[in-house]
């Protein structure tokens, strides 16, 4: 029973209580997608091999249905991302904030996602991960390199009803330290219908 109560608390704190959501976890390889999925599932931190094949986790307790797809981030895996866009409710795009050399590649992939017509109105939560590592990029630096300066929606409860504005925001996090991503999911949940 403790596990059920704990899991309810996690989803409620992330704003996903009583919502059905199909969420894609995307980003380059080694950004932390699988680690985040396992932290959300059972707060387990383990070393992962690179994701070779798409995986999904469907978590259900009471009225909660949360289906997350971890599609891998290496170049071959990115070719199948498009196959999962149908009926997606949100995209969580992870970026390794400590790997500045790959910011241009991360921007290119993000630009491709943002310009895809099948994702036009889908909320995007951008997580700059690994801020626990010294000299990781700041939020402003990451926004700049991803071309998101002045483009994001704004944090907090922003009402976008009746507009054609896509919800998109950057949150910095450390999955291994369990910090930052909760605020991002709370923000994203307000835009999941």
Curated annotation (Swiss-Prot):
One Pfam family hit: Arf
A GO term for molecular function: GTP binding
Keyword Transport assigned: yes
Subcellular localization, as worded in the UniProt entry: Endoplasmic reticulum; Golgi apparatus
SUPFAM superfamilies linked to this entry: P-loop containing nucleoside triphosphate hydrolases
Coiled coil: none
Entries under CDD domains matching the protein: Sar1
SMART domains in the record: ARF, SAR
A GO CC term assigned to this protein in UniProt: COPII vesicle coat
UniProt cross-references to InterPro entries, sorted A to Z: P-loop_NTPase (IPR027417), Small_GTP-bd (IPR005225), Small_GTPase_ARF/SAR (IPR006689), Small_GTPase_SAR1 (IPR006687)
Chief localization: endoplasmic reticulum
Keywords: Endoplasmic reticulum, ER-Golgi transport, Golgi apparatus, GTP-binding, Nucleotide-binding, Protein transport, Transport
Positions of GTP binding: 27-34, 70-73, 129-132
One GO biological process term: regulation of COPII vesicle coating
Primary role: Involved in transport from the endoplasmic reticulum to the Golgi apparatus.
Family indicated by similarity: Belongs to the small GTPase superfamily. SAR1 family.
Protein's name according to its UniProt entry: GTP-binding protein SAR2
Name of the coding gene: SAR2
